[in-house]
Swiss-Prot record:
It comes from the Bacteria. Gene3D superfamilies: YjbJ. Coiled coil: none annotated. Residues 20-63 are annotated as: Disordered. This is UPF0337 protein PSPTO_1596. Belongs to the UPF0337 (CsbD) family.
Amino acid sequence: MSSTSDKVKGMANEAVGNVKQAVGKATDNTKLQAEGKAQELKGEGQQAKGEVKDAVKKGVDKV
């Protein structure tokens, strides 16, 4: 998977996670809030993975 793909999927997961958290909070559904937080963290991880891939590629390109 490319770094851009990781970043895009990460942003999407983070956004969906935020929505789930908001809906869970509004409906007093703690399970949905927890699912949203987990999905948000997954998205943050995917974005970080994309950033690392970019950094590695830039490092390799310098060699």
